[in-house]
């Protein structure tokens, strides 16, 4: 099976580029006839027929037989062969990993969530990361040589084109993607976590035809994914979307980026954690008092569970964070005039406790015409 054209970034070979576009069409739209493809791609029927035949020979496309029609000659319908290849996706969080495998049509084959893992910028943490992925691949009910690629979502500054990560695992001179490929013996692509989540929503989530989208990733940190005219926006070096580092506050809180006053210092999971400790020390009460007194680690999950149990302190902190986030998002909306803003990430699981103050602040601080143009949804 020819896999080189799928993983190549060379767009000079027209034949291979068109094959990739055909596969992308099937991923986005499902099964289709030769005529459908020709119409959508503005190609002649003979050209499409030739390309589809080559993809059939390579095992990527299947002929599903005649399509039912009301009359005339019945055309054959074609679609992706789910068993022609598999992909593994890895979601890297502060204290756990989520790993999934999908087939060539994008259907889930296997999912493992909340795998314990401590993210640190050390060779030992990187080795543990690779070991967990190795173990997952071995457990799959497919041949390992059928794994075409591994996608890794990484927080912070990532350049997918060069394969470099500048926020985590940057202790070697080689690109992180290359290091992972050598260790895992499979093609690896790295991507910023917020952008990856944005694309996931665009392909399989709450997006319903919108082409100009902002995805706000509210987790331990704060990130942003941007889609303009149906395409992910990267910026010059792949560093777009650092929403959490808007300078919005005159505080003395040092952000992990090394600067003070970042939005992330007052409106993120890490801010939630810090403010809870500060307020508790000042005398406020919380159902997390036992953990705070014992010095036990408090996770984002613990904070959200306290909110669900109607902990007054945690709800108050979250509401204030929502207002700050809403102000920032209102500014983004005034700049980008998006059709859709998606609220996602772990903090979005707080539901209306965070979404209502965000929406209220957006209405207050965004331009009315822009606000009326934009729909706000919670990620599913």
Q: Where would I find each of the regions flagged by the language model?
A:
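ATP-binding/phosphotransfer module of carbohydrate and carboxylate kinases, centering on a glycine-rich
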Residues: 1-64, 69-72, 77-113, 118-145, ...
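Short glycine-aspartate micro-motif
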Residues: 87-91, 147-151, 213-217, 223-225
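Hydrophobic beta-strand positions
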Residues: 101, 157-158, 226
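Residue-level signal for well-ordered, solvent-exposed loop/turn and beta-edge residues enriched
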Residues: 107-108, 164, 231
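Glycine/GP-enriched mid-protein hinge/lid loop-to-helix segment characteristic of carbohydrate kinases
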Residues: 111-113, 121-125, 181-309
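Glycine-rich phosphate-binding loop and adjoining helix at the ATP-binding site
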Residues: 111-212, 353-363
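Short glycine-rich anion-binding loops that position phosphate/pyrophosphate groups of nucleotides
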Residues: 155-157, 220-221, 347
């Amino acid at each position: 099976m020819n896999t080189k054209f799928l993983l190549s970034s060379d767009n000079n070979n027209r034949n291979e580029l068109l094959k990739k576009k055909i596969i992308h069409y099937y991923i986005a739209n499902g099964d289709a006839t030769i005529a459908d493809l020709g119409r959508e791609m503005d190609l002649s029927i003979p050209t499409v027929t030739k390309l589809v035949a080559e993809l059939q020979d390579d095992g990527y496309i299947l002929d599903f037989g005649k399509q039912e029609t009301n009359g005339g000659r019945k055309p054959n319908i074609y679609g992706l062969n789910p068993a022609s290849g598999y992909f593994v996706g890895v979601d890297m969080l502060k204290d756990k990993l989520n790993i999934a495998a999908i087939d060539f049509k994008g259907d889930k084959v296997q999912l493992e969530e909340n795998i314990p893992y401590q993210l640190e910028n050390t060779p030992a943490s990187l080795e543990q990361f690779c070991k967990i992925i190795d173990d997952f691949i071995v457990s799959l009910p497919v041949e390992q040589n059928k794994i075409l690629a591994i996608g890794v979502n990484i927080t912070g500054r990532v350049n997918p084109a060069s394969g470099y990560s500048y926020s985590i695992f940057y202790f070697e001179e080689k690109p992180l993607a290359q290091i992972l490929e050598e260790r895992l013996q499979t093609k690896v692509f790295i991507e910023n976590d917020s952008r990856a989540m944005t694309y996931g929503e665009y392909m399989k989530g709450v997006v319903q035809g919108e082409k100009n989208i902002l995805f706000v990733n509210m987790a331990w940190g704060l990130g942003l994914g941007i889609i303009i005219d149906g395409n992910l926006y990267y910026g010059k070096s792949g560093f777009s979307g650092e929403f959490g580092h808007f300078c919005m506050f005159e505080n003395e809180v040092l952000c992990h980026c090394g600067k003070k006053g970042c939005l992330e210092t007052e409106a993120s999971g890490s801010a939630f954690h810090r403010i809870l400790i500060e307020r508790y020390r000042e005398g406020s009460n919380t159902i997390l008092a036992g953990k705070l007194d014992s010095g036990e680690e408090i996770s984002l999950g613990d904070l959200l569970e306290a909110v669900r149990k109607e902990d007054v302190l945690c709800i108050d902190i979250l509401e204030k964070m929502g207002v700050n986030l809403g102000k920032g998002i209102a500014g983004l909306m005034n700049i980008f005039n998006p059709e859709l803003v998606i609220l996602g990430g772990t903090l979005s699981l707080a539901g209306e406790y965070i979404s209502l103050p965000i929406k209220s602040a957006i209405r207050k601080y965004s331009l009315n015409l822009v606000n009326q143009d934009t729909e706000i949804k919670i990620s599913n």
